[in-house]
Amino acid sequence: MRFRAFVLFLKALRAYDRARLRLRMRLQPGLHIHPDASSNFAAARFSLEPGATLRIGPGAVTERRRGALRFDLRAGATVEVGERVWLRTDGGELHIAAFEGASIEIGADGFLNGATLSAKRRVRLGRHTFVGLGSRVFDSDQHDFDAERPEQAAPVEIGDHVWIAADTTVLRGVSIGDHSVVGTRSLVTRDVAAHTLAYGSPATARASVGDRSRTR
């Protein structure tokens, strides 16, 4: 009897969250959440300026932690969350920020764990790519260095089947090739070739990596 009551409670909670998501999408025309995405996205915080677009694909999931997942999109920005992406928040807050006119793309089957993505131009993550707990990806300096040296920005491209381990920072203009691994607490300031293990501060190539297409 108690189990049946619990199941009914969960069904009612999901229906409530679905209704909240439908209301949010009506109030924010740029917000598009696929009906097959998790109803837990109702617990996320969405801030979209006029002209911004956020799309969350089918099968995408997150935890039901109020405010632990935040999307901040300035005017004209676009964010695409692919099919079956897991935006995990039970280990820490996850923040995705796209500034004016910038874009962020998270490929299908990706996994982000309490991470930060920040784009002033473009940040792209390929299919089946993992970003570990506390890691950060920035495509800009974030601030001017001084009066003579203004902030610079350059797109970040992260390939398919890449694993960026915990507490790692990826800086502007970096390209990380397919099937590569970046070790924990690394600072990535230059390109990492495909099938490469890199770590350190700054991260440098240390070994080769095989096929990661079937990893979990």
State the predicted function of each range.
Residues 1-138, 159-161, 168-170, 178, ...:
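Domain-scale signature associated with acetyltransferase and cell-envelope carbohydrate enzymes
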Residues 117, 141-145, 175:
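Conserved SAM-binding loop
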Residues 146-151:
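Regulatory activation segment
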Residues 152, 195:
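Conserved catalytic loop/helix region of short-chain dehydrogenase/reductase
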Residues 154-157:
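Solenoidal tandem-repeat scaffolds enriched in leucines and small polar residues
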Residues 166, 184, 201:
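Gly/Ser/Thr-rich helix-start
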Residues 174, 186, 192:
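Short beta-to-alpha loop/turn elements within the nucleotide-binding domains of ABC transporters
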Residues 181, 187, 197-199:
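Short-chain dehydrogenase/reductase
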